[in-house]
Design a protein with these regions (language model features):
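E1/E1-like adenylate-forming module used to activate ubiquitin-like modifiers
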Residues: 129-208
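Aromatic pocket-lining residues of Rossmann-like dinucleotide-binding sites
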Residues: 58
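Hydrophobic/small residue at the entry helix of a nucleotide-binding pocket
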Residues: 50-51
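A structured beta-alpha segment of the ubiquitous adenosine-cofactor-binding alpha/beta core
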Residues: 95-132, 136-145
């Protein structure tokens, strides 16, 4: 049964499922805010440690629409920290595994998957109609990361980022009207890839 058939023929059942699945959110959020979450569309770049947990957490919170991107497959080395990495998913595409996991949590969640590297060929589609973007890209994916922030800023989309330095965590938000990603991390086009990565790491822990 395709998703569209499920949605068309069982919408009443889906509404009841959604209400029951999110009823314990009320108090943390209002019913009006829960309705907004259901209509929201979030783009998550990277389905590894951070992105996988972001997706499953947001699905459980009741967010109804996602764009997810990752070109990689799960490996044994991922099992210590990535939500979708299990013995049964080794070698499988991360976007496919995480999409299936999301639909198992909320059967009618809307997902659009991008299984190639984020680049000029797909960045506008990835951000199309999105309310918020989440940067969970690999530390080495700086060209894709810079493109993500630049296009999101141009489209008026906030980008949330987080990182786990040591046994702590950092979180930041780049809003369109605030300091740009390039300015905050002091990135310049004449920097080498290593210099860009080093500046990014330092910027994640400015007090460290």
């Amino acid at each position: 049964v395709s998703f569209s058939t499920f949605e068309d023929s069982r919408m009443g059942e889906w509404d009841d499922y959604y209400d029951q699945a999110t009823q314990r959110n009320i108090g943390l959020v209002t019913r009006e805010e829960q309705s907004r979450l259901r209509q929201a569309r979030i783009a998550i770049a990277g389905m590894g440690g951070g992105g996988g947990l972001a997706l499953t957490t947001l699905v459980r919170m009741g967010v109804g629409n996602f764009h997810i991107a990752d070109f990689d497959t799960f490996s044994i080395a991922n099992t210590n920290r990535q939500a979708g990495a299990m013995s049964s998913t080794i070698g499988q595409p991360k976007v496919e595994v995480m999409a299936a996991m999301a639909r198992d949590i909320q059967p009618a969640v809307q997902l659009t998957s991008f299984s190639t590297v984020i680049g000029m060929h797909n960045i506008d589609a990835f951000l199309d109609g999105v309310d918020v973007a989440v940067d969970s890209l690999d530390i080495f994916a700086q060209p894709a990361r810079r493109l993500l922030y630049a296009r999101a800023r141009a489209k008026g989309i906030p980008v949330v980022f987080s990182a786990p330095p040591g046994f702590s965590a950092t979180i930041g938000v780049c809003v369109p009207e605030g300091m740009s990603f390039e300015a905050y991390f002091d990135l310049r086009d004449d920097m080498t890839p290593f210099q860009i990565m080093a500046a990014f790491i330092v910027g994640l822990t400015p007090a460290g």
